[in-house]
Amino acid sequence: MIVISIAIVCGVFGLVLGSFAGAQVWRLRARQLVADKKAGESYDKAEYKKLSPLLKSKRQQDRSRCLGCGHQLGLRDLIPLISWLSTRGRCRYCSKRIGYFEPLMELSLAAAFMVSFLIWPWHLAGLQWVLFAVWCVSLVALIMLVAYDIKWRILPDFLTVSYGLVSLVFVVLRYFIVNDVKLYSLAIALVIMSGVYGVLYLISKGKWIGLGDVKLGVGLGLILASWQTAFVGLFLANLIGCVLVIPGLASKKLKANSEIAFGPLLALGSFISFFVGARIMDWLVIASFF
């Protein structure tokens, strides 16, 4: 009963932080558009007009707003998931559809928090809770990266660097608290998760893989911290990608040169591998003998 109660609390925290992450993703996009405009680069003018009100010069005006009508949102509009359900996915003030972006982020992070708690690989006691808290912070950064990549096909440096720093804190804490990190295995994990894509990026000059995926691989390599889980994470990312892409190519909904957001695949594959990667690796080794 206590375990279920704590899992529910983790889910609630996931909903709240998922709501926060969704709001920050829109603000990051707005800042990127402003930066592109100032630098004289091409940018989506319609999107710039819609998102620029999110960046107010005065702190008291920097509040969440409806992206359709610009109305400043009140407390009852910001309750994770409940506000969206109560208005049936529409703005309370202009009745325009809000979409599924925010509730999906909230639900995804809530599910990730709950699953992480329920199948956490080490006994949660004492400093283990600190390690778990840092893990949850890394998931917030990761869900923001996933959402940004899905929506705009780019992994911003601010988010990849932030995720990498949190991952570094996590692996250092894991080294001292759990004491299961081998430095040589960690180095190989970094080569697998980032180095492989770095080589592909250089060979293709950015046509096959984006530099953002290479940078994301650094953070994921630190989180996984072993060559076995890194190998499985990369394997799962490509396997999931094939499952999603091949039907699209067969039905001609996707073309050979279609741009695919690979960041979410890396994130999902790594999340699964963090918890069950060692078991999957054992299965792969056993299967290779038959």
Segments from the language model and where they lie:
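Membrane-proximal soluble regions of multi-pass membrane proteins
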Residues: 27-101, 262
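Alpha-helical transmembrane segments of multipass membrane proteins
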Residues: 17-22, 109, 113, 141, ...
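Juxtamembrane "helix exit" motif at the C-terminal ends of alpha-helical transmembrane segments
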Residues: 111-125, 171-174
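Membrane-water interface at transmembrane helix exits
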Residues: 22-26, 30, 95-96, 117, ...
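Functional transmembrane core segments of multi-pass inner-membrane proteins
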Residues: 10, 126-127, 131-240, 245, ...
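N-terminal signal-anchor transmembrane alpha helix
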Residues: 5-31
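Interfacial loop-to-transmembrane junctions
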Residues: 214, 247-272
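Select subsegments of transmembrane alpha-helices in polytopic membrane proteins
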Residues: 99-107, 157
